[in-house]
């Protein structure tokens, strides 16, 4: 099975838009990786996330705001021969984005971003109470670098 880079930005953005969750990689105080599955929204080259107002991940981001965020879609088990274990692979597409987190404090901007996140999952309209807005941490990650890959293609298949 073969792996190919995805060059087209539109296709990479399609992977992002069709993913249900993302995985956010940050660095803990000892320099170790720390990866969190999160809900998200994406618009105009910016990934939006939200979390509780305090906790370990926020402390880590205060020390180092660089993140790596991954997305994937279309997971399908494929093989070349059903009795040969090494011929099995997982066909899928992935996107990886790098950027720096900033936290949004403005209440109207929080509302707008929370709508972007919610519209990733549903077309419903929502309202947000002032206490809810005060107690949510809204993350903004402008994408600095975006790459994509397709995995598990047979020799004759094109990416």
Regions of interest found by a model, annotated:
Residues 26-28, 71-73, 143-145:
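Short, structured patches in soluble enzyme cores that scaffold and shape functional sites
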Residues 19-53, 69:
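Short beta-strand segments
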Residues 45-46, 65, 144-146:
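Beta-strand-connecting loop/turn residues
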Residues 57-81, 86-88:
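Helix-adjacent hinge/juxtasegments
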Residues 2-3, 76-159:
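Charged, gly/pro-rich active-site loop segments
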Residues 17, 62-67, 115, 119-123:
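Short, intrinsically disordered, mixed-charge
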Residues 1-18, 159:
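Extreme N-terminal tail/first-helix region
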């Amino acid at each position: 099975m073969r792996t190919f880079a995805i060059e087209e930005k539109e296709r990479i953005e399609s992977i992002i838009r069709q993913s249900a969750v993302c995985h956010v990689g940050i660095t803990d105080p000892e320099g170790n990786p720390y990866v969190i599955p999160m809900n998200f929204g994406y618009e105009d080259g910016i990934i939006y996330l939200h979390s509780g107002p305090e906790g370990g991940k926020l402390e880590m981001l205060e020390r180092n705001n660089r993140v790596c965020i991954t997305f994937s879609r279309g997971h399908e088990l494929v093989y070349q021969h059903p009795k040969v274990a090494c011929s099995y692979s997982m066909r899928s597409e992935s996107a990886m984005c790098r950027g720096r987190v900033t936290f949004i404090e403005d209440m109207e901007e929080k509302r707008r971003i929370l709508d972007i996140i919610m519209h990733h999952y549903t077309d419903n309209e929502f309202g947000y109470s002032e206490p809810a807005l005060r107690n949510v941490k809204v993350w903004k990650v402008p994408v600095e670098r975006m790459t994509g890959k397709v995995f598990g293609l047979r020799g004759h298949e094109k990416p």
